[in-house]
Curated annotation (Swiss-Prot):
Organism (species): Macrobrachium rosenbergii (Giant fresh water prawn)
Assembly with partners or alone: Homodimer.
Coiled coil location: 1-273
Modified residues (N-acetylmethionine): 1
Biological role stated in the UniProt entry: Tropomyosin, in association with the troponin complex, plays a central role in the calcium dependent regulation of muscle contraction.
Disulphide bridges: none
Residues in the signal sequence: none
Domain of life: Eukaryota
Tissue: Expressed in muscle (at protein level). Expressed in abdominal muscle.
Protein name: Tropomyosin Mac r 1.0101
Keywords: Acetylation, Allergen, Coiled coil, Muscle protein, Repeat
GO BP of this protein: locomotion; muscle system process; regulation of muscle contraction
Length: 284
C-alpha cells in the first residue's frame, strides 16, 4: 500500500513535472510561434523592402542612365563651348593684333600729319618771307624808278642846257664873225664858253652812263623780281600740295579712327558674347 502510495506520489510528481514540462514546452512553443510569426513578418517586411529597394534601384539606374546621357550631352556641349571659346580667343587675338596695327598706322599717320603741318607752317612762313621780300623789292623798284625818272629829268635838263649852250655858242660864233676885230679881247670869253661846253658835255655823258647803269639795274631787278615771283609761285604750289597732303592724311586719320571705333565695338561685342557664354556655362 505504501509502495502504491509512493508510486502514485511518484507518478503524481512525474505528472506534475510532465505538466510543468508541458507548460514549459507550450510556452516555448508559443514563444517559438511568436518568433516564427515575427520572423515571417520580418521576412515579409524584408521582402517588401527588397521589392521597394529593387524598384528604387530600377529608378536609380534609370535616373543614372538619364544623368549619364545628360552628362554626355553636357560634356559634348562643354567641348563645343570650349572650341567656340578657343575660336573666340583666336579671333580676339587677331582683333588685338589688328587693333595694334591700326594704332601703329594711326601713330604713323599722326606723325606724318604733324610733319605735314610743320612743312605747311614752314611753307607759309617762307611765303610770308617771300611776300615781304617782294614788297621790299617793289619798294626798291619804286625807288629805282624814282631815281630813273630823276636821271631822265636831269638828262632832259642837260639836253636843254646843251641846246641852250649850243644856241649861245652859235650866237657867240656869230658875234665872233661880226667882231673878229675883237677876237683878242673875246678869246678868254670863248675859252670860258668852251670850258663850260666841255663840262656840260661831260655831265651829259655822265648822265648817259648813269642812265645806262640805271637801265641795267632795272633789268637786273626785273629779272630778280621774276625769279622771286617764280619762287613764290613754286612755294605756293608746294603749300597747296602740302595742304592737299594734310587733307588726305586727315581723311586717312578719320578712316583709321572709324576703323578703330568699329574694332572696339566688335571687341566689346565679342567680350559680351564671351561673358554670356561663361555665364551660361556657370549656370550648368
Amino acid at each position: 500500500m505504501d509502495a502504491i502510495k509512493k508510486k502514485m506520489q511518484a507518478m503524481k510528481l512525474e505528472k506534475d513535472n510532465a505538466m510543468d514540462r508541458a507548460d514549459t514546452l507550450e510556452q516555448q512553443n508559443k514563444e517559438a510561434n511568436n518568433r516564427a510569426e515575427k520572423s515571417e513578418e520580418e521576412v515579409f517586411s524584408l521582402q517588401k523592402r527588397m521589392q521597394q529597394l529593387e524598384n528604387d534601384l530600377d529608378s536609380v539606374q534609370e535616373a543614372l542612365l538619364k544623368a549619364n546621357q545628360h552628362l554626355e550631352e553636357k560634356d559634348k556641349a562643354l567641348s563645343n563651348a570650349e572650341g567656340e571659346v578657343a575660336a573666340l580667343n583666336r579671333r580676339i587675338q587677331l582683333l588685338e593684333e589688328d587693333l595694334e596695327r591700326s594704332e601703329e598706322r594711326l601713330n604713323t599717320a599722326t606723325t606724318k600729319l604733324a610733319e605735314a603741318s610743320q612743312a605747311a607752317d614752314e611753307s607759309e612762313r617762307m611765303r610770308k618771307v617771300l611776300e615781304n621780300r617782294s614788297l621790299s623789292d617793289e619798294e626798291r623798284m619804286d625807288a629805282l624808278e624814282n631815281q630813273l625818272k630823276e636821271a631822265r629829268f636831269l638828262a632832259e635838263e642837260a639836253d636843254r642846257k646843251y641846246d641852250e649852250v649850243a644856241r649861245k655858242l652859235a650866237m657867240v660864233e656869230a658875234d665872233l664873225e661880226r667882231a673878229e676885230e675883237r677876237a683878242e679881247t673875246g678869246e678868254s670869253k670863248i675859252v670860258e664858253l668852251e670850258e663850260e661846253l666841255r663840262v656840260v658835255g661831260n655831265n651829259l655823258k655822265s648822265l648817259e652812263v648813269s642812265e645806262e647803269k640805271a637801265n641795267q639795274r632795272e633789268e637786273a631787278y626785273k629779272e630778280q623780281i621774276k625769279t622771286l615771283t617764280n619762287k613764290l609761285k613754286a612755294a605756293e604750289a608746294r603749300a597747296e600740295f602740302a595742304e592737299r597732303s594734310v587733307q588726305k592724311l586727315q581723311k586717312e586719320v578719320d578712316r583709321l579712327e572709324d576703323e578703330l571705333v568699329n574694332e572696339k565695338e566688335k571687341y566689346k561685342s565679342i567680350t559680351d558674347e564671351l561673358d554670356q557664354t561663361f555665364s551660361e556655362l556657370s549656370g550648368y
